[in-house]
Structure formats: structure tokens, C-alpha cells
């Protein structure tokens, strides 16, 4: 006899064969063995299946006799048939008392017990009473394969898969009953549910020996087993599929699902078309929803629409799963009208529908609509909470995501790894050091901090929350058995964000040599961003060449990163070339090229590109409109009326509500063209309290136009607000310093330090001979420090001769005039430009310098004089864009 190894499983639970009297169900007289069929029919027809009703119908019950004649035997059979009917009704109405009543009469039977016992087992398990089912089972003198199968399948339905396995092994050990096809289907289902795939494979061998492989139900269950097994592939499923002599729709669906899971959507569609050619087979809702989920790129867009048409033709548009899949499909292809139309036409919705709608609205940036859908969900679960929280993170609403996470904790909603990952991501968006430490501690306390996904998210969070030391410690202690590629990518991005791009490049080279970094679209995109931040064009070009050779250039996000990289490296020609050679563009592609023109302060070209965008009917996003409004600062002529029209019509034309970023950009445009009063009125008419960034935009414009009256009012507003970010603390401190309130300035700095914030020091750097030479104010760490300082002294003297006058108003320290000049003369940008002049004698080649913050007014004036003294073009990029200093003039026209 062929058996299966079961030494690893627990023994079957012991139930005594003889049931103690106190455990026996109470015998009701209503269910006596001698009930006439018409009486049972009247009983079963009653909608109230309570024992009291049964008792009322049984007043004429008679006792059993020792012998039966033919008529009495027929009566017993009729009564047993009535029991079956009662069991069906009790299962339908979930009335366990009737089942127990049948059970009581069952115990009095001397014959015909097995068939009724099997029905009792099934009914008890359907009602969720496994112990009572076992009591019936052990009372059977000769359980059949149906008895065992009823227990196995019932236990599986009740998530008692281990108990189901025990029953199967008891059956095999007894050796009196052989499993049938339904037994194999039930036990394979249990194996899949508890991930006992190796056991399932052993059972596969038993199925082959038992000759049940020709059963379509058994073969379908085997395909499902191999489909769910991570150690198997779709080839194993296909092999089984090819061996099935007769297939049903479930067979086709299983193999299609397996191909979709492995990303072989084209092969799945080929099988789908083959399925349609087989006579007698029609697709069902599972087929369509599975194939729709595989439509993730533009190459299968038409196929997805074809599936939609097929669903309409064959009448599957009322199926929930099909509608849910269609909503997911159209949201991937940015067709919100279709999504909303499908949702409105649905007769019913479920949790999946709401989750798909929340995800769709969030992907379109329609946060309020997503929140409204969530609010209308009556039975919220972990999945709906996770969808909303992930959507908040995707749209940059870290604080809202954290509040939702807190709500989940208070309501006792079950947390998953995805929930915690989103909460950690939200901390990174908020950039609150203390909050990040609390979430980090929460993950450690509940033992999830070492989950690979959460661990990577925690490292990334540390890089965003002023905790680079913690991030470096986590990276150094990264488990050797885990892939470190994502962690490496995160910490490289962290270095770039925290003003340490040189460290990012150094780590990139080291991990690349140690083969700890896998170069894919994500890592290449990140390192291109670092190259752009550094202005390291040569390295960016090498990455570009590698991407071409590796076949990554078709990736849109990589193309967008290349545009951005070349733009930040002052190479707009190559940025335009990349844009023109891309096979397809998304809104980010257009945004990247518009941003390129703005960095060069070329507003007219940016607006021309915006016109092309409108001609192609490409829908802008929030960032697009921010960039386009900003472009009006850099036009050759005043185009304020067009800018004003665009700003005021954002909601009506593009369905985008103006945000703080749009107000900030518009105020800068008004300030640039000298309309300070209108800018102030715009701020005062904002529907919400203006944020510091908007007020700062107006304050900068007041500096440019020397308008002290408006500046005082704006400064007063800024000082009345509570700072929330490091930049807001620094601005408030600087305002106090500029006004001579040194003590108040220091108090603000102290409060900033208490919150764990620190100011990123001003830093300038230059790329020379493929090396990054970095400087901060009064830096003496460079190997050529003496030559640099000597050269700078000479440059200062020469500039003083031709009219340069140091402007000590830009020194915000409480020191004497002599020290203020000393501070001014040794700013990081001056040191970097001096090194650039000394290290390059090529007169026709510009000196290229990068600075991480806005260039101060004194340095700006100084570089105009240097361009005259040394007869060299100086190209400097700061946070506002590029400055081209040529012959004593700057491309920004002193308006930056």
C-alpha cells in the first residue's frame, strides 16, 4: 500500500468511541423514527426551525418496535429522507438546534447510520461546530471515504487545515478506505492553505499511483498547488495543463493566472485566444479580471480595451470582479473619466471596489475624492486603510498618513507589513526626528524592524529625518543574507538629500566595485539625480552610456532623469536632445524640460514648450502649473496678464486648486515685475493662512526692489508664525539678526537645536579632473589651501581697484566691521571660484561652480567684477538657477 510520510504532523485528536451521557445531544420526541412523511414535510416547511416548533409537531409520536415489516421499513427510509431535508434547511438558516435534534435521533438508529452520519458531519462543519462533527464521525462503526472527505473539506473551510491533514493521515494509516477524487481535491486545498507544498507534491505521487490524474478536478487542484508554490514555476503548471485529457474553464483560468503572476502577459493572452477557439468554452469573470490585471504598460492597452468590449458582449459587466479589474486597468492608463463612469454604473460595490477607487483617485492626485470614498465605506478593513495611507504618502501628505496610522491603532485595525512601511514612509515625508524615533521604536518593539521591506524603509526614513548617523549604522550592520542593493540605493539618496553628494558618489563607486549594488532603472535614476545635484556631467554621461548599452533607455523615468541631469549640469542642448529622442513622454518629461529652461532663466522657451503641451492636449499636473507660472519671471517682456489669467483659471480649466506652491510662484512673479502691493493683496486674499514660503517670496522681492515698508509688514507676519521646518527657523533668526535683535535670534537657534534640527552649512564645489573639490566658509582643509587664499587676496585687491565695494549687510553675525569683511571675503563660493581660476588656465573655458544655497548679494557683485578682471566667464548654479557672469554682467539681471 502506497503511503505518505506524515511523521511531522500531530496525531488525530482523541475522541472516546463511547460518548458519555452528558455529552450526548438531547433526544427530542419530535424526531422519533416513526414519523409519517407528511408530518415531517409539515415540520420542515416551517420557517422557524426551533426545537420548540419540532416538539409541538411531535405530540403523536410512537415508540420503536423490535421488528419491522415492509411498510415500517419504507417509513424509516422516508423519515431519514426527511432528516436530510431538515439538515439542508438547518444549514440554510444556520439553526444548530435542529441539527442537534437530528443528531439525537441519529444516535438511536441501529441501521442506515453512515449516510445520515456523513450528512450530519457536513452540516455541523458548515455551521462551524467541528467538535460535534468529530463526535458524529467517531460514532460511525464503518466510516466511508465520504465520511473522511466531509471532515477534510469541512476542516479546510474552517481554517483548520492541520486537523484536515490529521484526518487524511488517519485514513491512510487505517488502510481500510481509499481516497477518491474529492478527497484529493480537499487535501490539496488544505496543503495550499498552510503552504505545505512539499506534502502536496508527495500527494501528487499518490494521485498518479491511484489513477486519479485524469480527473479534471484533481488536475485543477494540482495546478493550483504548483501555481501557489514559490519553488515551482508556470512551466510546471503548463506541463500539468498539457497532460489533462479533458479541461474545464477552471483549468484554463489556473494556467492563465500562473502566467500573469510570472509577468508573462503576452503568453497569457495567447492562451486566452486559444481558449476562445476551443468549442464549448467561454471565458468567465475570473479570466477577464486576471488578464486585465496584467495590462500594465502601453503595449497591452488595446488588449485591455478589447477585454472590456468582450465583457460587454458576453454580459459580464455586472460581475464585481470584472468591474473592479476594469477600474484598476483604466486608472493605470490615466483615464479617470472611464474609472468614474464604471464606478457610477456599478449596481453593487465591495471592499475591493472602494480600494481600487481610493488608489485611482490618489494616483491622479485627487486626495479629497479618495478621502470621500473612504468615508463612505461602511466596513473599513486593513486593505482600505492601507490604500488611503499609501495614497497620502504618494501625494506627499505625510502628516495625514500618520494621523490615519494613529486612527488604525486606536480602532484596533490589524496592522500588516504594508501598514508599517507606509507609516515609516510618512515619517520620512514629515521629516520630524522625534516622530521618526517613535515609529522606529514601535517597529523594534513589535519585532518587525528586521523585516526586509520595513528595514529598508526605516533606513530611508533615517536619511530624511536628520539621522544620517543612524542610517550609516544600519547600513554597516546590514544582514549579509539580505540583498543590500535597495539599502545602498537609499543611503546614496540620503547623502544626496543631506548635502553630501560627494559621499554619495564615493559610496556608489565602492559598492559598485564590491558588487553590492545592482544597477537597474531605480539605482541609475538615483545616481543620475546625484550627478545632477553635483553638476558632475562627465559621470552622468558615463551612466547615460551604460543605460544605452544595457537597454534601459526605453524606460521613461530614466529618460526623465537624464533630462534633469543634463539640465542641472548646464547642458540644455543635450537635455533637449534626450527629450526629442524619447519614444514616449509623460507629464514628468515635459516638466523636466520646462524646468531646464527655467534653470537657464529662459522663460520664453519654457512658455513655448507649454504651448506645445497644450496643443498635444497633455493634461498638466500640480508641478507643471507651478513651473509655468514661475516661467513668467524670466520672459524678455512683461507678460503678467497671461500669468494672472493662468493662475486665476487653474480650477476651471485644469481642475487643479491653487496650492501654496502656486501662490508662492505667482507672488514671486508679481514681485519680480515690481508689483509688490498686488503681491501683498494676493497673500491677504488667500483662502487659508499663508505659509512662510509665500511670505518669504514677497520678502525677497522687497529686497530686490528696496521696498522697506512692505518688507516690514511681511517680516512682522513671519515673526508671528511658529516655525515648523529648519528653513523657517533660519529665516526667522536671520530677520531678528538683520534687525539687530541678536538675543532673540540666538533664542530661535536654540529652539531649533532642541527640536533636533540643524542648519545645512552653505557649501560650494567644483569638479576638476573628475574629482569633487568642496568648500565651506573660511575653509582651510583643501590641500592647496595656501595657494587658494593667496589667489583670493589678489583677486579681491584687483576687484577693489575697479570699483568693488564689500557689502557687509549680508553678514548676520554680531561682529565688528573688520570681521564682517573678513567673513565676506572667505565665503565658500569665492573660495571655489578662486580654485577654479587657479586650476584651469584655459581662457576660453568657463569656470563652473555649484552652490547648495542662494548666492549672497556680495558674492554676486564680486563675481561680476572677477569676470572683468580675469576675462573669464563664470557659470555658477545656486538654488535659484544658473548665473552666467560675463564682462561684468549676470544673466539674471541682478534679479534672483
Swiss-Prot record:
InterPro entries: DYW_dom, E_motif, Pentatricopeptide_rpt, PPR_At4g14850-like_plant, TPR-like_helical_dom_sf. Residues 801-896 are annotated as: Type DYW motif. GO terms for molecular function: RNA binding; zinc ion binding. The keyword Repeat applies. Residues 694-769 are annotated as: Type E motif. It comes from the Eukaryota. The keyword Cell division does not apply. Residues 770-800 are annotated as: Type E(+) motif. GO terms for biological process: embryo development ending in seed dormancy; RNA modification. Keywords: Repeat. PPR repeats lie at residues 113-143, 144-178, 180-214, 215-247, 248-278, 284-318, 319-349, 350-380, 381-415, 416-450, 451-481, 484-519, 520-554, 555-585, 586-620, 621-653, 659-689. Signal peptide: none annotated. Pfam families: DYW_deaminase (PF14432), E_motif (PF20431), PPR (PF01535), PPR_2 (PF13041). May play a role in embryogenesis. Belongs to the PPR family. PCMP-H subfamily. This is Pentatricopeptide repeat-containing protein At5g03800. It comes from Arabidopsis thaliana.
Amino acid at each position: 500500500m502506497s503511503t505518505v510520510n506524515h511523521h511531522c504532523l500531530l496525531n488525530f485528536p482523541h475522541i472516546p468511541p463511547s460518548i458519555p451521557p452528558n455529552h450526548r445531544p438531547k433526544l427530542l420526541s419530535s424526531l422519533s423514527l416513526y414519523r409519517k412523511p407528511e408530518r415531517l414535510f409539515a415540520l420542515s416547511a416551517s420557517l422557524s426551525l426551533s426545537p420548540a416548533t419540532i416538539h409541538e409537531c411531535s405530540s403523536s409520536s410512537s415508540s420503536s418496535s423490535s421488528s419491522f415489516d415492509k411498510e415500517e421499513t419504507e417509513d424509516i427510509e422516508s423519515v431519514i429522507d426527511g432528516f436530510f431535508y431538515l439538515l439542508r434547511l438547518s444549514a440554510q438558516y444556520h439553526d444548530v438546534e435542529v441539527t442537534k435534534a437530528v443528531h439525537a435521533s441519529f444516535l438511536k438508529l441501529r441501521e442506515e447510520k453512515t449516510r445520515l452520519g456523513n450528512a450530519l458531519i457536513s452540516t455541523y462543519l458548515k455551521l462551524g461546530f467541528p467538535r460535534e462533527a468529530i463526535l458524529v464521525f467517531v460514532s460511525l462503526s464503518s466510516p466511508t471515504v465520504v465520511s473522511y472527505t466531509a471532515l477534510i473539506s469541512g476542516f479546510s473551510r474552517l481554517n483548520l487545515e492541520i486537523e484536515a491533514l490529521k484526518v487524511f493521515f488517519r485514513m491512510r494509516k487505517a488502510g481500510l478506505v481509499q481516497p477518491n477524487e474529492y478527497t484529493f481535491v480537499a487535501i490539496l486545498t488544505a496543503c495550499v492553505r498552510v503552504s505545505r507544498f512539499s506534502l502536496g507534491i508527495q500527494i501528487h505521487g499518490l494521485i498518479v499511483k491511484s489513477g486519479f490524474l485524469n480527473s479534471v478536478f484533481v488536475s485543477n487542484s494540482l495546478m493550483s498547488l504548483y501555481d501557489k508554490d514559490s519553488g515551482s514555476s508556470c512551466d510546471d503548471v503548463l506541463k500539468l495543463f498539457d497532460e489533462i485529457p479533458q479541461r474545464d474553464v477552471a483549468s484554463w483560468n489556473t494556467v492563465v493566472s500562473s502566467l500573469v503572476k510570472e509577468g508573462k502577459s503576452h503568453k497569457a493572452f495567447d492562451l486566452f485566444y486559444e481558449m476562445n477557439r476551443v468549442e464549448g468554452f467561454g471565458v468567465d469573470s475570473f479570466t477577464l479580471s486576471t488578464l486585465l490585471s496584467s495590462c500594465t504598460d502601453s503595449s497591452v492597452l488595446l488588449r485591455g480595451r478589447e477585454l472590456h468590449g468582450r465583457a460587454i458582449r458576453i454580459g459580464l459587466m455586472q460581475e464585481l470582479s470584472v468591474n473592479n479589474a476594469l477600474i484598476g486597468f483604466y486608472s493605470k492608463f490615466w483615464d479617470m473619466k472611464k474609472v468614474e463612469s464604471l464606478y457610477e454604473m456599478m449596481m453593487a460595490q465591495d471592499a475591493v471596489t472602494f480600494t481600487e477607487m481610493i488608489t485611482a483617485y490618489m494616483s491622479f492626485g485627487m486626495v479629497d475624492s479618495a478621502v470621500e470614498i473612504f468615508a463612505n465605506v461602511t466596513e473599513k478593513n486593513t486593505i482600505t486603510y492601507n490604500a488611503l495611507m499609501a495614497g497620502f504618502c504618494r501625494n506627499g501628505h505625510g502628516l495625514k498618513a500618520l494621523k490615519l496610522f494613529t486612527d488604525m491603532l486606536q480602532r484596533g485595525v490589524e496592522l500588516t507589513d504594508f501598514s508599517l512601511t507606509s507609516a515609516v514612509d510618512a515619517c520620512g515625508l514629515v521629516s520630524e526626528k522625534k516622530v521618526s524615533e517613535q515609529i522606529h521604536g514601535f517597529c523594534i518593539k513589535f519585532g518587525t524592524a528586521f523585516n526586509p521591506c520595513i528595514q529598508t524603509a526605516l533606513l530611508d526614513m533615517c536619511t530624511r529625518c536628520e539621522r544620517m548617523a543612524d542610517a550609516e549604522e544600519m547600513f554597516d550592520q546590514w544582514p549579509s543574507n539580505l540583498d543590500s542593493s535597495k539599502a545602498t540605493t537609499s543611503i546614496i539618496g540620503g547623502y544626496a538629500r543631506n548635502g553630501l553628494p560627494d559621499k554619495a558618489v564615493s559610496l556608489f563607486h565602492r559598492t559598485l566595485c564590491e558588487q553590492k549594488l545592482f544597477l537597474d532603472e531605480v539605482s541609475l535614476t538615483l545616481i543620475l539625480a546625484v550627478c545632477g545635484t553635483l553638476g558632475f556631467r562627465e559621470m552622468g554621461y558615463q551612466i547615460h552610456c551604460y543605460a544605452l548599452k544595457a537597454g534601459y533607455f526605453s524606460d521613461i523615468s530614466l529618460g526623465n532623469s537624464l533630462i534633469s541631469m543634463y539640465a542641472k549640469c548646464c547642458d540644455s542642448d543635450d537635455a533637449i536632445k534626450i527629450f526629442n529622442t524619447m519614444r514616449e513622454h509623460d507629464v514628468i518629461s515635459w516638466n523636466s524640460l520646462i524646468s531646464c529652461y527655467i534653470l537657464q532663466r529662459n522663460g520664453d522657451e519654457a512658455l513655448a514648450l507649454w504651448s506645445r503641451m497644450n496643443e498635444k492636449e497633455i493634461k498638466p499636473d500640480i508641478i507643471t502649473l507651478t513651473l509655468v507660472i514661475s516661467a513668467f519671471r524670466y520672459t524678455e517682456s512683461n507678460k503678467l496678464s497671461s500669468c494672472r489669467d493662468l493662475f486665476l483659471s487653474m480650477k476651471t480649466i485644469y481642475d487643479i486648486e491653487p496650492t501654496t506652491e502656486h501662490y508662492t510662484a505667482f507672488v514671486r512673479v508679481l514681485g519680480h515685475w515690481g508689483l509688490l502691493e498686488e503681491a501683498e493683496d494676493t497673500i491677504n486674499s488667500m483662502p487659508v493662512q499663508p505659509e512662510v514660503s509665500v511670505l518669504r517670496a514677497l520678502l525677497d522681492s522687497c529686497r530686490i526692489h528696496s521696498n522697506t515698508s512692505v518688507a516690514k509688514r511681511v517680516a512682522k507676519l513671519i515673526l508671528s508664525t511658529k516655525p515648523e521646518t529648519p528653513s523657517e527657523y533660519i529665516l526667522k533668526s536671520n530677520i531678528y539678526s538683520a534687525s539687530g535683535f541678536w538675543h532673540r535670534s540666538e533664542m530661535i537657534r536654540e529652539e531649533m537645536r532642541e527640536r533636533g534640527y540643524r542648519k545645512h552649512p552653505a557649501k560650494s564645489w567644483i569638479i576638476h579632473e573628475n574629482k569633487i573639490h568642496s568648500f565651506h566658509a573660511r575653509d582651510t582643509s583643501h590641500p592647496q589651501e595656501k595657494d587658494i587664499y593667496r589667489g583670493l587676496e589678489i583677486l579681491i585687491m584687483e576687484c577693489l581697484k575697479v570699483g568693488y565695494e564689500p557689502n557687509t549687510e549680508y553678514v548676520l553675525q554680531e561682529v565688528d566691521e573688520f570681521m564682517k569683511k573678513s567673513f565676506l571675503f572667505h565665503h565658500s563660493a569665492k573660495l571655489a571660484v578662486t580654485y577654479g581660476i587657479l586650476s584651469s588656465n584655459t581662457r576660453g573655458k568657463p569656470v563652473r561652480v555649484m552652490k547648495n544655497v542662494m548666492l549672497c548679494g556680495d558674492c554676486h557683485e564680486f563675481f561680476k567684477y572677477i569676470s572683468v578682471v580675469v576675462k573669464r566667464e563664470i557659470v555658477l548654479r545656486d538654488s535659484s538657477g544658473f548665473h552666467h557672469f560675463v564682462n561684468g554682467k549676470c544673466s539674471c539681471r541682478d534679479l534672483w
